């Protein structure tokens, strides 16, 4: 099957396969689980929290680094598809706890791959990586999958090493693994530790709670490749269905957006003027890979994917999500 489509018969997916999703309670995990349920999958989820946040999922609370528990779950579920999203998902998380963060991202990947090596070597596994595996200073044009990998952050290193480990299991154990190098994405439900959600929350606080009409920002002189999370999870689904074994795929919009544009778009949501306070110690893009725009030609050609949601719609929905969240807390 090497070099052929990871799944070369749509009949297989008409049989409601068992789909295992690690990190299901995360920002992307929740969106992906809901999409897969709509597409008729039997979704099983793994995360560290006590309860699953997605209705309709068979849930297992566990530590992804616990190899024996991962193997037992895989033996029980017998998944045909595995989306591996579990791990520390932000550079700031690595800065605060580098040792444990690195262990989670690396050992969690090994636990999942090794379990599938012994339980179900025919399953298709998607390892979600990051654009931080690239060196943002390397390419004046868009990054393609052929660009060298040279991460400049500890988080990027963890994703780079995870991909190397995945390639080892492809070559030496014949596992059917595909890889993403996912660029920045945002949308409803994202943590305010990320720039778009941070600003949307601050503006919503002013509107809902009559907070002081002032927004705190850091440096906004950055151009960033943003995708809507709903486009991203659809790309993951299509890579699972049509991606090629051992291949990496950039998941990105292919367009750069200036942070200043995003800021002023969100400020326009307010019914009253908002002053801007620049904090020199605050980095607007601390969890955002800045200066890095991707090329998505390979993903488009091999899976038929294309981004459908413009950044303005993404920001509209993100802002409205925050308004609803704050209104619920208010009452």
Q: Over which residues does each language-model region extend?
A:
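Amphipathic terminal alpha-helices
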Residues: 15-17, 311-331
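N-terminal Rossmann NAD(P)H-binding glycine-rich loop of SDR-like oxidoreductase domains
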Residues: 19-38
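Catalytic helix-loop patch of NAD(P)-dependent Rossmann-fold dehydrogenases
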Residues: 96-99, 103-111, 124, 132-179
